[in-house]
Amino acid sequence: MFKSKKEITVEEFMRELERDPDFARRKAVREEELARREAESRKEQATLLRALAAVGVNVSTVWDLVNTSASYTVALPILLDHLNRPYSDGIREGIARALAVRATRPIGWSVLVEQFEKTEPSNTRVKDGLAVALAEASDDSVLGELIDLAKEKRHGDSRVLLLSGIKRSRRPEAKEAIRELAADPALSKEIHSWKRGSRRPK
């Protein structure tokens, strides 16, 4: 079957777009805006990045820590110190998510809880980042506190992200909490999805 003259490939279509002056101008504006935002973000993070570099953690953005499998325990005290500083939401979220490791619990659990309690649900990015950090940093020694946070409806939909920390525990109170939280409209969908995922075809 032959391709008609009106049919073009994606590559051909993109080449035609590149030749369109309006498209090229819009693309240049988008790229310029992206470069500007990246430069502003690097400038805003400069103090944090210098502090990290001083302990041997060399990254171009705090989000590099979120996306690495390498250990950076030495950086945790610095991240905790900067978590409460007046950064933009995107950077604060990155700091919070970088603290989402088990080694944070012994040195920074109270800081994470305090920041989670203080952050309004309307600040979704930071609130979610802190919830992820709490869930990943938690262990059985703070299980009761994690459950209490998940039950507090004033914390909004970010509570869904706390559930993985509760689910990970094998303690009876964790299972009881999950059963109770399954009745919460904001959490029930996530909890019921676990049950569906655990079913095996016969």
Regions found by a protein language model. Name each.
Residues 39-51, 72-85, 104-118, 139-151, ...:
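Amphipathic alpha-helical scaffolding segments comprising HEAT/armadillo-like alpha-solenoid repeats
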Residues 12, 18-21, 116, 147-150, ...:
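Generic low-complexity, intrinsically disordered sequence content enriched
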